[in-house]
């Protein structure tokens, strides 16, 4: 009868699970094009936010649908701007940004503000938050953040921000992005 110590058994188990968890080398050929990939992930409904900053005192912003909460303690959020975004290359110099969660009332604004070069603050009511970032007065929620990390990820950046301040408005219909279009969701429907 073979006896195994707990430490030896655990060590062997960890070694096996590590060996199984190691992904294959990145030599696989992608069997789909970017349009098909975009259509696939477009089936996942996301919220829409207007990320803002004030580099050199000038308001700048971009529409994102990649906002995610990362951590509660400390409070962290992330979003993913394109690495080719000229707006983000300016905004990142401020080291602070605002996140404005958009609602139904922002649908026309989101469509208008999405193209590069658009005057993204035209017709908006906004004010500077405590940390000096532009915040929409009618956002469903507004967060003031400091950049704590930025990681390259393919053709985008993953930006992580620590939330320093926030405000939440009464519940309203959120703006969502689904299948390549801005849409709204009504509360109370099943």
Where are these regions (language model features)?
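Basic, polyanion-binding surface patches
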Residues: 2-190
């Amino acid at each position: 009868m073979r006896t195994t110590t707990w430490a030896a058994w655990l060590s062997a188990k960890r070694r096996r699970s590590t060996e199984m968890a190691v992904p294959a080398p990145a030599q696989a050929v992608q069997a789909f094009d970017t349009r098909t990939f975009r259509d696939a992930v477009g089936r996942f409904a996301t919220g829409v936010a207007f990320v803002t900053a004030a580099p050199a005192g000038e308001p700048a912003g971009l529409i994102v649908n990649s906002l995610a909460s990362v951590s509660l303690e400390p409070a962290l959020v992330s979003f993913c701007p394109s690495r080719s975004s000229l707006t983000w290359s300016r905004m990142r110099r401020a080291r602070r940004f605002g996140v404005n969660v958009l609602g139904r009332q922002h649908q026309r604004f989101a469509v208008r503000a999405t193209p590069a070069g658009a005057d993204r603050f035209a017709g908006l009511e906004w004010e500077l938050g405590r940390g000096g970032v532009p915040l929409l007065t009618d956002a469903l929620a507004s967060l003031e953040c400091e950049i704590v990390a930025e990681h390259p990820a393919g053709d985008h950046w993953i930006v992580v921000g620590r939330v320093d301040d926030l405000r939440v408005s009464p519940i309203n219909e959120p703006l969502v992005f689904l299948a390549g279009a801005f849409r709204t969701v009504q509360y109370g429907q099943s």
